[in-house]
From Swiss-Prot:
Disulfide bonds: none annotated. This is Spore crust protein CgeA. Coiled coil: none annotated. The keyword Glycoprotein applies. The keyword Glycoprotein applies. Induction: Expression is regulated by the sporulation-specific transcription factors GerE, SpoVIF and GerR. Changing residue 133 to A: No change in SPS layer formation. The N-terminal half is required for localization to the spore crust, while the C-terminal half is necessary for spore polysaccharides (SPS) addition. Changing residue 110 to A: No change in SPS layer formation. Involved in the formation of the spore crust, the outermost layer of the spore. Plays a role in crust glycosylation. Required to initiate spore polysaccharides (SPS) assembly and serves as an anchor protein linking the crust and SPS layers.
Amino acid sequence: MSSENAQLKKDLIKAVLSPLFPTATEGGENMDSNLKALLDAAIDQKVDESETVTAESILDPSLPARWIFARITPGTTISIVTDSGDMIGPVVFVAFDQVHGIVFVTQESSVTPAGQATTLIDVDKVESVTFFS
């Protein structure tokens, strides 16, 4: 995203939140302005952080689970072991939201009526991935 788009995003968020901060003073100090300034700084920082997420940082081999899921073809059958030791699968890989770090998988429901269940997994909680041929 370009810097103009990032600035527009910041300005829009601030404009939506501005009615929450009418000018008022308490003890001679404008408390709402101080709070608004802190919120503005937090918005700027968060938007700037989201702008620094690039393809290079998402595909960085030092982040192995992200690296793996960024390269899996949708429709691939896999099993996932989480950092808590839970095994998920076999499941069918659907998609990977690289910005938010969410893995989407589906599996046939074992309850009636028959259907599919979609599971969303935090990529940072994945310990290993097994591929089936």
